[in-house]
Regions:
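Domain-length cofactor-binding catalytic modules of enzymes
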Residues: 271-273
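Functionally critical, mid-to-C-terminal surface segments that flank or help form catalytic/ligand
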Residues: 252-253
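Active-site microenvironments that recognize anionic phosphate/pyrophosphate groups
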Residues: 1-163, 169-237, 243, 256-261, ...
């Protein structure tokens, strides 16, 4: 529907003292707010108000859609393959560079559902399969290094539209949290087995499925912070089989329902972390084949982190860099299990 964003509009600026990266994305200031819209661009029948879809479910366009994946009209990063940087003399200014990547939106229901708890189960599961397919596509591009998912649900979590949706990003660098997680295990070749075992011993497991364990974080940044961890090692979500993807969708909905009962009205974020697309140097995989697992600890696993927004981030969190939780991990788990 819309023209590709100007590649100059999205940049990454680096703080020279901390090394912290900041994405400058002027188009984000134009994101519409729910209260300012006459019609919702994500509802069925309003497809002309969004960019052309990349993926849909079902794939047959003769059938009504249940979930759609579309380019974000107000991106954080710009795909320079479709919006190339203009040729300008000289090197980029010190301290910043173009923000290259892919930024998509996953519309999780054709109805104007405001909560994932009211989305029809087939549509909800289909939205996760679209995300998996899209990450699988992007992993084959040699200009992208990492990809993941995130959701903002509610105003306190950063959502501007109520219609249920999540977002997918693929970047040309590995985000600092992923670097830190890969390094945190040290010599532990299977850190997630230990994480699950300790959670079981400390009674922090909230719920389980055939393929996943939902546990309260050992160091929650907010009360009720919950992680969903696969039982079996696997660094990439886009390699997950259909039963794992469907099981993840169902378990996410169960945990969000528990959070809603334990803290009614709480907004929340979640994000899915996985390993870099190509995690080691060496020969590239054959065309059409997924990148190798090398360079990632054998037991490393993609996982989902759900963070309720119960307390605001204040000066201590922002200035000191540490979080404060008013509820212990064990108490959070007891509360979630009890509702």
């Amino acid at each position: 529907m819309s023209e590709p964003p100007d590649a100059r509009s999205c940049q990454i600026h680096v703080d020279p003292l901390s090394g912290r990266s900041v994405f400058v994305a002027p188009a984000r200031a134009q994101c519409p707010r729910e209260e300012a819209l006459d019609v919702c661009p994500f509802c069925a029948g309003n497809e002309h108000l969004t960019p052309d879809e990349v993926l849909r479910s079902p794939a047959d366009r003769a059938l009504p859609w249940g979930a759609r994946l579309i380019p974000n009209r107000y991106p954080i990063v710009v795909d320079h393959r479709f919006s190339p940087m203009p040729a300008t003399p000289g090197a980029p200014a010190a301290g910043h560079r173009p923000a290259h990547g892919v930024h998509d939106v996953i519309v999780e229901s054709p109805r104007h559902d405001r909560s994932i708890l009211t989305v029809e189960a087939p549509h909800w599961r289909a939205s996760w399969e679209l995300a998996r397919q899209r990450l699988e596509q992007l992993a084959l591009r040699d200009d992208l290094v990492w990809g993941g998912l995130f959701k903002n649900s509610g105003r306190a979590a950063g959502a501007s539209l109520d219609h249920v949706h999540s977002q997918l990003v693929a970047l040309d660098f590995v985000p600092p949290p992923i670097v830190a997680q890969l390094a945190a295990g040290g010599g532990d070749r299977d850190p997630f087995t230990r994480i699950i075992a300790v959670a079981e011993r400390e009674q922090r497991v909230v719920a389980t499925s055939a393929d996943l364990v939902a546990l309260v974080s050992p160091a929650p940044r907010q009360p009720l912070e919950t992680w969903l961890v696969p039982r079996r090692p696997g660094p990439w979500f886009h390699d997950a089989g259909p039963s794992v993807v469907a099981g993840l969708a169902d378990l996410v909905r169960e945990i969000v329902a528990r959070i809603e009962r334990a803290a009614p009205g709480a907004d929340f974020n979640w994000w899915l972390h996985q390993a870099p697309f190509r995690a080691s140097s060496g020969p590239e995989p054959e065309a059409g084949r997924r990148p190798r697992e090398g360079g990632v600890p054998p037991g490393w696993r993609w996982h989902l982190e759900i963070l309720p927004r119960i307390s605001p981030l204040a000066g201590f969190e922002l200035g000191i860099g540490c979080h404060i939780s008013t509820l212990s991990p064990e108490a959070s788990a007891r509360r979630l299990r009890g509702v």
